[in-house]
Every structure is written in C-alpha cells, then in structure tokens.
Amino acid sequence: MAFDYKEKFSVAGKKCIVTGAAQGLSRGMAEGLLENGAEVVLMDLQAEKLQAVADEYCKMGYKAHAVAGDLSKKPEIDRMFAEAMEILGNKLDVMIPAAGIQRRYEPWEFPEDA
C-alpha cells in the first residue's frame, strides 16, 4: 500500500500565518498553502505591496488576508497577531515565520527581547 502523503499532509481548511509574504520565498509558501485550500493571513512591512498580493489572491478565489506592520517591534507584533487571530477565528494551524529582519549585534550584546 502506497503512503498517501496528500491526505496526511493536507492543509485544506487550515488556518495559517506567513510573515514576509509580500514577495520572495515567503510569498511562494503562502501561495502554496492557498492553492491547497488553506486560509492565510499574509504579513509584511510593505503595506501597499502586501495588500496588492492579498487582493490578487482573493480575485483568484483564495482566502487571503493582509496584515501589515513591523515585526521587529514588540507592540506591532502584538497588534498584528491579535488582528490575525481575530481574522482566523482564534485558530492557528500553521505558522511560517519567514520575514527577514536584520539587526546587527555582537552575539554577547544581543538583547534578550530582540
């Protein structure tokens, strides 16, 4: 009997968040989830670009939502995730934290909250 990976790893109906989703690999991962039946909250710093991406996916019939903000700032993280969880009905099945955030510190100087 062959292993049915499509059923075992299905994301149909799953609630997902993908950060950095306005472009690049993150956008590709979000698109893969959407194409396979997931509802996805797209997050990125680039608000206009992110909204255009979400609108494009919605026109294709996918359940895509844009939540823009700066994931390098704790208050913004809290706001963004509260908004995302409200959109997703307080359910989260898949989280892809793929936003590229660069901070330059020596390893011994890196703040605990960064």
Language model regions located:
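Conserved residues in the N-terminal Rossmann fold of short-chain dehydrogenase/reductase
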Residues: 42, 67-68
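Canonical Rossmann dinucleotide-binding motif of NAD(H)/NADP(H)-dependent dehydrogenases/reductases
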Residues: 5-41
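Structural signature of beta-strand start/N-cap positions in the alpha/beta core
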Residues: 15, 39, 63-65, 91-93
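Rossmann-fold scaffold of SDR-type NAD(P)-dependent oxidoreductases
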Residues: 19, 92-100
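Conserved mid-core segment of classical short-chain dehydrogenase/reductases
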Residues: 78, 102-114
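Conserved glycine-rich Rossmann-like NAD(P)H-binding loop of the short-chain dehydrogenase/reductase
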Residues: 36-53
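The beta1-alpha1 cofactor-binding region of Rossmann-like NAD(H)/NADP(H)-dependent oxidoreductases
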Residues: 47-48, 68-80, 112
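Glycine-rich phosphate-binding loop signature in dinucleotide/nucleotide-binding domains
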Residues: 84-91
